[in-house]
């Protein structure tokens, strides 16, 4: 975009801020014709603006070394260290960061991934309206795998026997949706967020989302999106938020016009606090505003009783009610996938857990990429 702005003569200079947190070599790579190696800012705000407004050191989700360059150093293997054979199991954000960083340092790295593509949870995230740029992170890591010489084994589910020859095993095997202990959770109208985003199971017109964390909000945006996303279609964004790019309206402000939501959605949480209170400090408000625009019912203080043909039976504000819904989507947390750990440790192998396999309570790409990078830097 910046190149096009200059080429079109629309500006003499393009200023950037967050993109240089994501990749300090942005300009050098562009000048060298290596734009495909730029670690692109995904506009998430999670480690830059959110940190700033919390009084924390500014950094970057996709580049944890930003503002920590003298602390988190990536040095070639030397001295009392020796190059190791490293197996990284799982090619999500944590595994990708670990594998590429370890290989840059001189370790011999093999990356195992049971899927036929890299990305893990980012392959789900990039489908969410407004998160399309997450695909750029996978493009970046794909190129880094090539450049750093990581041996990538896609479509291969590693077993303990496959990993015996490695000096270090890193389990970045991710998570699986947590199934709550609610009567009727096995009813045909119940699906998980993974069923919806990955497997594309059909979803009805009336939907209840159990769980209003980050995943719940993402699924709500996904299910209510009607037509192209405003993140990739500026005219849609302008219409939704009442922006008159022609300035025919006073101050460039016009009456918002929005598509009707694709579905009727209720976003439910057990906690009695404000729905979405745990979202990012600088982005939570926009998610809640979008939900309001799309007529999503955001309901706190819900006790789930059972699910049956009639719908979702619950207690809300002390009153029993039945939500007449076609589909119930479980966004009720995750469980770590780390079955290999016990067998590997029993064999005496060095095993490290990173990403969701380490802490599955809330999916956190910032923590995952930081963990992967820091571990690789320490090997």
How would you describe each model-predicted region?
Residues 1-89, 93, 98-109, 117:
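Flavin-dependent oxidoreductase catalytic cores
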Residues 8-9, 31-34, 127-131, 283-285, ...:
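Short, hinge-like loop/turn segments at secondary-structure boundaries
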Residues 120-166, 276-302:
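N-terminal Rossmann-like dinucleotide/flavin-binding domain of flavoprotein oxidoreductases
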Residues 42-57, 166-182:
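Helix-enriched interaction subdomains in cytosolic or periplasmic regions
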Residues 1-32, 144-156, 161, 205-217:
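Repeat-solenoid scaffold signature
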Residues 12, 122-130, 354-361:
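Short beta-alpha connecting loops at secondary-structure transitions
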